[in-house]
Design a protein with these regions (language model features):
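Transmembrane alpha-helical segments of multi-pass membrane transport proteins and ion-pumping complexes
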Residues: 21-30, 48, 52, 70-74, ...
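Transmembrane alpha-helices that form the ion-translocation and gating core
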Residues: 31, 85, 90-149, 289-346
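Membrane-interface alpha-helices at helix entry/exit sites of multi-pass transporters
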Residues: 90, 149-165, 170, 185-189, ...
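Membrane-interface junctions of multi-pass transporters
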Residues: 31-37, 49-94, 211-219, 223-306, ...
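Alpha-helical transmembrane segments of multi-pass membrane proteins, especially transporters
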Residues: 21, 39, 43-44, 94-103, ...
Length: 349
């Protein structure tokens, strides 16, 4: 579609595309604060409006996907970097229990709903249930901004997210292997060994590498680039091991946690660049995936969407409630855990 001389829709000029996204990132908080709409939600809505299913101003091309992937990894890395390690160890059992709750409850409800309500096959129902069980930390910047990132409930929710995402991806790997007939003994040995080696490599060697680098390099730019290298290296190692890359980014954050003090200039740079560029690009990219017209094409789409929304909300609330009752948490902490576990993106697509 031709607008002006040399300007067509969707925008092809990289300068115009980048300018438009920067204007959205700049204007969104100014407008949305007056409307009492959360900043993160506003960026997702903006992505839906300008994306291929909206006004078609910008395509979700490789540059948007790259920036969005970096943003999601950045969120997971920051959650690991912000973690109070002593509190994380203290609440490790609670995170494990919550992770099992928030994986098993949605998994069970998802399989039943997929098979009996939606009429899917058993394998399709299990895959759908895996999407129910998985979650991300998309709202972590809000939690960090509110100053509750080190609260016990947040620690439990973050740890539980890693557990449930790991289990969900392993489930996906197993189902794919079963469908293709590759679940022999070597499949299980290879999967188990690769996961253990990946976790051990990141948690044991990353701190040593980081300590050596920070000791021998004092250049601010080089230190920040080194951190980015560690984030993406951890994510890729997790991918090679058969895990979700966000797990590797989170482990990289935990591994470098003690090397980057909370009030250090490097930490300020990490948070600034993430909150200003990477994370907003990710949220806008998520919005571009939304095709609102799909809800009006046929009754089946509305039915599937309604079942997913109701069951995911119910399952995650039940998991948060069970966690509260098990560990005698307050109702506010239950609400925080529930809110943190309802966050979904396209991480399993």
């Amino acid at each position: 579609m031709l607008l002006f001389d040399g300007i067509t829709l969707p925008l092809e000029d990289p300068i115009l595309k980048f300018l438009l996204i920067l204007v959205i990132i700049l204007a969104a908080p100014l407008l949305l604060n007056k409307l009492k709409i959360p900043y993160l939600l506003g960026l997702i809505i903006a992505g839906a409006v300008i994306g291929p299913h909206g006004l078609n101003l910008v395509l979700r091309d490789s540059s948007i996907i790259l920036s969005g992937t970096a943003g999601l990894l950045y969120i997971m890395f920051l959650s690991g970097l912000d973690m109070d390690m002593s509190d994380f160890r203290k609440n490790g059992t609670r995170s494990l229990v919550f992770g099992l709750y928030t994986f098993c409850v949605p998994l069970l409800l998802g399989i039943l709903a997929g098979y009996y309500i939606l009429g899917f096959s058993i394998y399709s129902s299990i895959l759908l249930a895996g999407l129910f069980a998985s979650q991300t930390l998309i709202a972590y910047p809000i939690v960090s901004k509110l100053g509750i990132a080190r609260d016990k409930a947040v620690t439990i929710a973050v740890g539980g997210t890693v557990i449930t995402d790991t289990l969900a991806l392993l489930l996906l790997t197993v189902i794919v292997g079963m469908v293709t007939g590759n679940t022999d003994d070597m499949f299980w040995y290879r999967l188990g060994i690769s996961v253990v080696l990946c976790i051990a490599f990141i948690m044991q060697l990353f701190p040593l590498i980081g300590h050596w680098f920070f000791k021998h390099c004092s250049d601010n730019i080089s230190q920040y680039i080194f951190v980015l290298v560690m984030v993406f290296l951890g994510a890729y190692l997790a991918h090679l091991a058969g895990l979700e890359p966000i797990i590797g980014a989170f482990l990289a954050g935990l591994a470098l946690n003690r090397l980057i003090p909370r009030t250090s200039p490097l930490m300020n740079r990490i948070e600034f660049v993430g909150n200003a560029i990477f994370i907003p690009f990710f949220l806008i990219g998520v919005g571009m995936l939304i095709d609102y017209r799909a809800f009006f094409r046929d009754w089946e789409s509305i039915k599937v969407a309604a079942v997913m929304i109701v069951l995911i909300t119910a399952a995650k609330y039940i998991a948060a409630l069970l966690t509260q009752k098990t560990f005698k948490l307050s109702s506010d902490q239950r609400t925080v855990i529930f809110g943190r576990s309802e966050e979904h993106t396209s991480e399993l697509q």
